[in-house]
């Protein structure tokens, strides 16, 4: 039900403001969202503010029992969602048939049997949506929207490190009067709440964004029940800078490595720069990197804290590995200490040169504000080197020559290649990775196909009874 006065926008703003105004660890504990009701869990866990390194709110530590309750609510709601008036369903069926005809140029009426064939897309059922911590609202919404449009009901499992955003979003669904049980959310750790969602026999589909290690386990577990799976996993994204690149693009190239502290799966972490401009480029790039302001994200800064202490230690470890492997650290590379946030997890943009392609910092996903720059000579050489890792999520190419751009893009093994730009997203285009970076594609048509099952219906109009 909507709020009594219909003024849900003001109520929604008040919920957010209360979160902002509450001192660390003094806000009331958060709750799961099951069948349009905010339900207290069996137990809570601390959510840590990475800017200060201190707990700031308690969130549910979701159990298998709570996941089961959310799935049961979604399963029950699916019966109602499927109960569409016959006239509306007929309209959908023949609209699909017309769309199929227009897109394939095939006649519907077969001369021999006078049959009409059309394709109907049915919702799959209960969808399990497991989203990561780095872009918590965007990446959850990117899954939620097509899943709901296709007619599914959902159980969301946001990262336990950034569950507050999803909790606020659930308030929006409740305030606007979304049908009971269509959208549900369970917070908690992946090894408990997430694992139960993957294993549940009434969850027919899993959409996951996260690490390659966890994604491969989800794929293995889901295969036992033949569930549909979409996996958007890790990356070690290359950027290729040709000697004739536009120098005005240097700021965008740096941004492609350090936006959101480098905690975006699409960030550039390996830069291949053509030899004639290598030294000049590194100098200009370091100057750009040093312009990024590191600080508490409540102020006007470009680089905030690493998401967690564990992740912060991981990034620091890779920087130490780079030093031990003979890498040259041009900037960053050390903990940044901030007044009032001495225990926060801050690392300044770090630029490294002098590492071979086989080094860990050139092959492993670091997922932080760390980039390795290395020279190359020819297009053939750099394409082979860029494709040499086990990942294939995205890449960037920078050149003033259109043929050079397109020839390189065509040879790169990546789900998305940006030419003279970065993160320019057209949401109708397929999105996903190659190799160890993912399975499946999402985005408009691809999402609707993933979140639905295609059914072919053949009707013999010539039959007489």
What is each model feature region?
Residues 2-3, 51-57, 203, 240, ...:
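Conserved C-terminal structural/oligomerization subdomain of aldehyde/semialdehyde dehydrogenase
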Residues 53, 91, 151, 183, ...:
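Residue-level signal for inorganic ion chemistry
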Residues 213-356, 419:
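ALDH superfamily catalytic-core signature
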Residues 65-68, 72, 82-103, 115:
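Long amphipathic alpha-helix in the N-terminal Rossmann-like dinucleotide-binding domain
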Residues 103-248, 300, 376:
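Rossmann-like NAD(P) dinucleotide-binding subdomain of oxidoreductase/dehydrogenase enzymes
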Residues 130, 189, 209, 256, ...:
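Conserved residues at the C-terminal ends of beta-strands
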Residues 2-82:
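Short, structured beta/alpha segment
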Residues 50, 64-67, 246-250, 278, ...:
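Residues at or immediately preceding the N-termini of alpha-helices
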């Amino acid at each position: 039900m909507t709020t009594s006065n219909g003024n849900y926008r003001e109520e929604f703003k008040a919920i957010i403001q209360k979160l902002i105004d509450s001192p660390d660890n003094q806000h009331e504990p958060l709750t799961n969202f099951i069948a349009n009701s905010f339900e207290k869990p069996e137990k809570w866990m601390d959510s840590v503010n990475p800017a200060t390194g201190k707990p700031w709110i308690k969130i549910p530590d979701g159990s298998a029992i709570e996941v089961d309750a959310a799935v049961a609510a979604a399963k029950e709601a699916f019966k109602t969602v499927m109960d569409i008036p016959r006239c509306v369903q007929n309209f959908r069926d023949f609209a699909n048939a017309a769309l199929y005809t227009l897109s394939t140029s095939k006649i519907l009426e077969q001369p021999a049997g006078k049959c009409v064939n059309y394709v109907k897309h049915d919702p799959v059922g209960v969808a399990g949506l497991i989203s990561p911590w780095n872009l918590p609202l965007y990446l959850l919404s990117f899954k939620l929207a097509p899943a709901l449009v296709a007619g599914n009901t959902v159980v969301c499992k946001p990262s336990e490190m950034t569950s507050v955003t999803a909790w606020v979003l659930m308030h929006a669904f409740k305030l606007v009067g979304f049908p009971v049980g269509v959208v549900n959310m369970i917070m908690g750790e992946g090894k408990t709440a997430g694992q139960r969602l993957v294993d549940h026999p009434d969850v027919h589909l899993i959409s996951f964004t996260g690490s390659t290690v966890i994604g491969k386990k989800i794929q293995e577990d889901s295969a036992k029940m033949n569930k549909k799976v979409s996996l958007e996993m890790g990356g070690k994204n290359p950027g290729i800078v040709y000697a004739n690149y536009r120098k005005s693009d240097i700021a965008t190239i740096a941004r492609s490595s350090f936006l959101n502290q480098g905690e975006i799966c699409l960030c550039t972490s390996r830069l291949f720069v053509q030899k004639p401009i290598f030294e000049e480029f590194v100098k200009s790039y370091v100057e750009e990197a040093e312009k990024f302001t590191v600080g508490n994200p409540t102020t006007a800064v470009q680089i905030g804290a690493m998401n967690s202490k564990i992740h912060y230690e991981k990034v620091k470890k890779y920087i130490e590995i780079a030093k031990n492997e003979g890498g040259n650290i041009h900037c960053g590379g050390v903990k940044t200490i901030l007044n009032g946030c001495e225990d926060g997890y801050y690392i300044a943009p770090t630029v490294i040169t002098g590492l071979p392609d086989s080094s860990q910092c050139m092959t492993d996903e670091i997922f932080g504000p760390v980039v390795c720059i290395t020279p190359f000579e020819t297009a053939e050489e750099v394409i082979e080197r860029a494709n040499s890792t086990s990942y294939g999520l995205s890449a960037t190419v920078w050149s003033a020559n259109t043929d050079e751009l397109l020839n390189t893009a065509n040879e790169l093994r990546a789900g998305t290649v940006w030419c003279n730009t970065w993160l320019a997203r057209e949401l109708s285009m397929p999105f996903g990775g190659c190799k160890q970076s993912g399975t499946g594609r999402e985005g408009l048509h691809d999402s609707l196909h993933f979140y639905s099952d295609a059914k072919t219906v053949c009707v013999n109009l010539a039959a007489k009874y």
